[in-house]
């Protein structure tokens, strides 16, 4: 009898031991999970503060460029291509982009249209010519240009030949309405009629959405690879190839004035009316810049996009700051 009791006692002890081991393992797992969570939070906070430090550095670089020259050009410190810098337990990678080296879609909100208008507004022709230069079919390009204006103007009436308003978007699935205000980001352009994924990918390097309906293209910072935008401003006289050659021959520190730029031989054949119209939207300085940086601390990553604005060409102010973005997700095309 005692032998049987000893066997039962041993089984009970083994069961208790198994339960204790299981509880200990669970506690250890939870402790490790909490430790990892705390580590990730600390790393993310560190990356966040690093990103603000990068923003402050970019601000100084922009302000220094204003002090060093009367113009904004690609020879200045801010214009370095994407750089990577080491940090404690990580790194930062980023670049600054001149936001006046692209077509401001919100500038269309300032276009004045009247019922008896015969001639298409200049900015609409520029956007249409840009899209055509990017191999978008002519009719589709005109529809996109007109629809973009209708999408961001303040009324809900159709004033262009090929544009659409709320009634069109309400018929889609899911239904939505035209913004009737400025775009907050160029990615919102995807909601406009006929702006498909292929068109968006082609045009995105050439367009932007600034918080203003004003637009000036800085001819000193427009990359030669994006010469199609310059060609669109002088269409149909200036070809993309000639525009690219013109930008590749740009002085090291850029042109001193818009008149110096317009005096280039490549533009001598441009119609005077087109020249004068384009001149209104050309510049050799800039007021808007965007920092796009990614900070990596261990396995925690923070992406920051900061929009700087200067109204006095002395100090730069952050008027918009965003964290995260499109690059946070890498799409697996094989599953689509």
UniProtKB/Swiss-Prot annotation:
PTM info: Cleaved by prepilin peptidase.
Coiled coil: none
Record keywords, A-Z: Cell inner membrane, Cell membrane, Membrane, Protein transport, Transmembrane, Transmembrane helix, Transport
Gene assigned in the entry: epsK
Family matches, as InterPro entries: GspK (IPR005628), GspK_central_sf (IPR038072), Pilin-like (IPR045584), T2SSK_SAM-like_1st (IPR049031), T2SSK_SAM-like_2nd (IPR049179)
Pfam families associated with the record: T2SSK (PF03934), T2SSK_1st (PF21687)
Location, primary (coarse class): membrane
Recorded family membership: Belongs to the GSP K family.
Residues spanning the membrane: 8-28
Biological processes per GO annotation: protein secretion
Intracellular or extracellular location(s): Cell inner membrane
Protein name according to UniProt: Type II secretion system protein K
Tagged with keyword Cell inner membrane: yes
Residue spans, topological domain Periplasmic: 29-336
Domain of life of the source: Bacteria
Keyword rRNA processing annotated: no
UniProt lineage: Bacteria, Pseudomonadati, Pseudomonadota, Gammaproteobacteria, Vibrionales
One Gene Ontology CC term in the entry: plasma membrane
